[in-house]
Structure formats: C-alpha cells, structure tokens
Amino acid sequence: MCTPDENDYKTSTDPDTSANTNHTLEKKKRKKRKNTNVACVNCSRLHVSCEAKRPCLRCISKGLTATCVDAPRKKSKYLAGIPNRELPMNIQPDLPPRKIMIPIYNNSSNSSLNVNNMGEQQKFTSPQHIVHKAKFLSNAADSEYSILSNIIYQDTLSNKIPIDILYSNTNSTSNSTIGNSSNNSPTGTNTSPEETEMEKIRQLYSEQRANIPPHPYPSSNQNVYSILLGPNSAKIVASQVNLFANHFPLVPVDSADNSLSFKRLLPRDPSEKSSQINWDSSINQYYLNSETVTFPELAIPLKRRKNHLVSVSLESCSPDAANIKSNVEWEHSLRYSTPMEIYTSINAPFSHTPGFHHLLVYLKHRFNQQDLVKMCRSIAEFRPIFIACSVTLTEEDMIFMEQCYQRTLLEYVKFIAQIGTPTCIWRRNGQISYVNEEFEILCGWTREELLNKMTFIVEIMDDESVRDYFKTLSKVAYRDFRGSEKMKVCRLLSPIKGKIIHCCCMWTLKRDVSGLPLMILGNFMPILN
C-alpha cells in the first residue's frame, strides 16, 4: 500500500478549510462597519434607509421636511401599558421635538404668544424638569405622592409643573381661569417661578373653598399671633392671610422678667398677677396651670433649688373645663365631638400636600444643605410604602381614612384626658393636630397658638431634636411595625427666647387600615435634673 508523499499534504487544497478562513475574514470586516443611523419617522414607516442629518434628502424631495424627525424608540416591556404623556420625562421614549408643531404667524401678538408657549413647552419637555403623574385612583394620593417625589428628587418646586395644573382635568374651568390670569398678567414676566406657582396655588385654594361658608379669621377675637410670628407679626395679622393655608412659624420672644405675661390677655382673676408663682415651702412644691404659671417660667426658681428635691403639681380644673374640645374650622384637628357627626359631615379627604410643601420650605430656611439632604433621605423611605399602600385606594377610601383619623382622635382625646401625661398628636406630615392641657403647661404654648394655624411639631424643637425627629420618623413609620420608639434627643422651645425644656419623648404610631402612618402620639416628660 503506497502512502502519499508529505509534499502532497502541503500542496493539496482543502475546500472546507478555505471556506472557514473566508468566513472569519468576513466577520472581521462586519465588525468594522459603521453604526446605522436612526431613521426618521417617514423613512421608518416605509422601511427604507435614511441618513443622519435632518431633514433627510428623501423627505426634502417629498416635501416632508416639517415631519422629518427621529422615529421614537421602542419602550421597555414594563412601560408598554402606560401612555407616554404619563411617564416621567427621564424614562419617556425619544419623541419628536414639540417646538416644530407650533406655527408662528405674522401677527405680532400671536407670534409673541406662540413663542412663550414654545418656551414653556420646551421647559416642561426638558429632562431637567421631571414630571411624574402616578396612576393612583385617588387625587389626594396623587397629590401627596407628587410632593414627596418633588422633595426627594430636586428639593424644590420652582421648576416643576404646578400640582394644581398637573393633577386636574384639562377641560375644567378652574385651569382655564388660572391660565388666562397668568398669561394676561402684566407683571407675569417679572415674577419668579416660585411666586407664580404660589399665586396659582392661592387661586386654586380660593376656588376650592368658594362654596364653603366663610369662617372667622384665626385669632380674630384674640390677637394671639400679634407678636409670636416674628418681626412682621403685626403685618401678618393685619393682612388677614389664611393661616391654615399659609405657613408662618412660631418665633420665641424676649422676655425681661422670664415670664409669659407678654402674651397673656387677661389673668384669671383681676386681683391675681399673671406672673405670680404658687409655691408651698413646707413640701417644696410648685403649682402650675395653663393660664397663669407654666413650666418654662420655673427655669430660674428650679436652678436656685437644684440641690433640693422639688415637686411640681398641676392645679385641677373643673369638670366642665375637661369636656372634649372640637372645632369644625380646624380641618387638621378634632372637628366633631360625636361619632355620628364624623361619619355624616366629613365628605372630603384631608390633603397632606400643602403640609409637606410648607414643611420643606420651612426646613430650607432653617437648616443647611447637608442637614436638609439627610432629612429628605428619611422622607424618601416613605415613598415605596406609600405606593404599595395607596395604589389601589380610591377617593372614597381616602375619605374613609380621614373619618378613621377623626374617630380615632376622638377616642384618644377621651383617654388622654384621664391620664394627665403631656401629649401632642401630629399627622404624618408633621402638622400638629391635638395637644392636651398638660402639654400646654409643659412647653408654654397654648392650644389656640398651636392649632389656630398650620403648625409643625419641628417648630417647637431645637435643631438637634429636629435632626433626631426625622431619624426616629424613619424608624417607627417605615422600617418596622413595632409602633413605638423613643427619641434620643428631645428639647422643646418655649415662647420665652432662650428657655429650652429638656424632655424624654416616647412615640406611639397609629396606622390606618391600609398600613399608612395615620397619626403619631408623642408623650413628653420633663427632665428636671
């Protein structure tokens, strides 16, 4: 048997080997080819090639230059069922720019109006202006989620679409009224975005309350805020601005005699001085009440007797004074004193949106950026829980939640009146909803001063306590469901400037039927040593 020579292997050509070599060379050539251009809308519809520049040559020849824009890219599968207009701008598919859809006429007034509209559309279609409209079944839940998103993402409302425009029907008369007033205003071009937005919110609020009978202006009979709202207190009271819709923080006042006589209208008895401190030397005991002597006024006497055991006693009030106090005009507080009134009279949900908005504005004026970021992180933990609990809630459910709040608050008020522990109740946005008489005596702020306007619990805390407040809030409300937590630091600010009450504060969280934080009960006890 003859064997082939070695040269035969070298000179012979294998067809399979040459084919594989050619295939490898073709692959290398394919890798080096240029990326294909994104076709325009017209070329993509006809499945023909397109060039990079706009308008392309084919659209120029066909006379379709006005609509020659990049074809929108395919959306992700999890966004397939959501319309493009309801998506946040940062995840919307690439759409044709809207500026070419606005014709500019020769008329000067029309052209200026169209240019303004073009600028406004470009502003709201810019990626820097994130617009979110969650698919909640309740307008109240939509509004609250929107303000939480605004707080977390950019900490400002100046470059967002106003909530009253974003979450209202396009064919409503209120929106057209607001739009016309803003466009026809002669000073509209000179106002800042924040002022324009606040003006729209005020107009919307006035329209919403147009059908509600007028209520007495807060503190119309007693000017309790004439000196407690800072240097401009008198002007604020004289302007009769709605203190429930606009926030003005409480400001401590300098007191020469370290008493609260500067804000007491009349003493209980004409023969009794308002600054008189009742003291029983035989048992080293002070007697306090909410009308004449409160705990902050004992700062100096307690320092003098710091080496002695001192006790504090509260003067008992009459049975009539211990009745349940409700006010129909205080929407954030206890409005009715019977369950029947609660279930028959409450027909609208309570909006937490203004409270969150004003809380953020207040924190911005009080704290630096570093502290503000930490507080916003604590608030950010609330968003996923809010989505999970509220996505299926309807407007009727939100009304029922407010009825549950009022009904629960009514029962707690009865219970708190029998305990005697200084207690303050606030909503999940920090707005104070109820205080008992013992809390008035402890901090020096009266019930009318705290509830007759929009007041946040952080207003009467020092800076370190506010920082710990948001840490405690994230623990008790969002991380676990124990329902109780103790603040590490709690120091209350009294109406007397410089007088701080060191306290031990224990939180008790009450949730609604959907799991959302309904109310927070804070029990405060003074630290005497």
Swiss-Prot record:
Keywords: Activator, DNA-binding, Gluconeogenesis, Metal-binding, Nucleus, Transcription, Transcription regulation, Zinc. This is Transcription activator of gluconeogenesis. Its main location: nucleus. PROSITE patterns: PAS, ZN2_CY6_FUNGAL_1, ZN2_CY6_FUNGAL_2. Residues 1-31, 174-198 are annotated as: Disordered. GO terms for molecular function: DNA-binding transcription factor activity, RNA polymerase II-specific; RNA polymerase II transcription regulatory region sequence-specific DNA binding; zinc ion binding. One of its GO terms (cellular component) is nucleus. Residues 14-23 have a biased composition (Polar residues). The gene is ERT1. Residues 174-193 have a biased composition (Low complexity). It is found in: Nucleus. It comes from the Eukaryota. Residues 408-480 form the PAS domain. One of its GO terms (biological process) is gluconeogenesis. The keyword Metal-binding applies. Residues 40-68 bind DNA. Pfam families: PAS_13, Zn_clus. Transcription factor which regulates nonfermentable carbon utilization. Activator of gluconeogenetic genes. Belongs to the ERT1/acuK family. NCBIfam families: sensory_box (TIGR00229). It comes from Saccharomyces cerevisiae (strain YJM789). Disulfide bonds: none annotated.
